[in-house]
Amino acid sequence: MSDIPGDLKFLKSHEWVRIEDNNRAIVGISDHAQNLLGDLVYVELPNIGDHLDAGATAAVIESVKAASDIYSPVTGKVIEVNTTLSDKPETINEDPYGEGWIMVIEMQAPEEISDLLSPDDYTEVLESDEH
């Protein structure tokens, strides 16, 4: 398992969120998730301007093994999507916590962050899944 950046929060479904200034939340999937999925071949991105509720399906990623929904960790409006993924979905495999981000959400309820998992809590979820 790769190192999990300490500035992220997680959902049990393996999405991560990095909070920036101005209530901006960058969202992607964990290294663990991309490893489980294998080589990604397609990413269906949300539309800029879409309103997402926390826990709602925001995007879909497809690999040679399976398709998987990506859930929004927070409530808000999509203000940016990673268009690079349309041509190079494998960017998620190569750099899930960096260049492989999926979308940026302008949060409407920043307090939702407290409901998400810390890196340590997420690591515990992964370890309990392995047993």
Curated annotation (Swiss-Prot):
Annotated coiled-coil segments of the chain: none
How is the cofactor bound, as the UniProt entry phrases it?
Answer: Binds 1 lipoyl cofactor covalently.
Q: Which UniProt keywords apply?
A: Lipoyl
Q: Which residues are recorded as modified (N6-lipoyllysine)?
A: K65
**Domain annotation Lipoyl-binding: ranges:** 24-106
The Gene Ontology CC terms held by the record are: cytosol; glycine cleavage complex
A single Pfam family it belongs to is GCV_H
Q: Please give the PANTHER family that the UniProt record associates with this protein.
A: GLYCINE CLEAVAGE SYSTEM H PROTEIN (PTHR11715), GLYCINE CLEAVAGE SYSTEM H PROTEIN-RELATED (PTHR11715:SF3)
On subunit structure and binding partners, the annotation says:
The glycine cleavage system is composed of four proteins: P, T, L and H.
| Record's protein name | Glycine cleavage system H protein
Origin species: Xylella fastidiosa (strain M12)
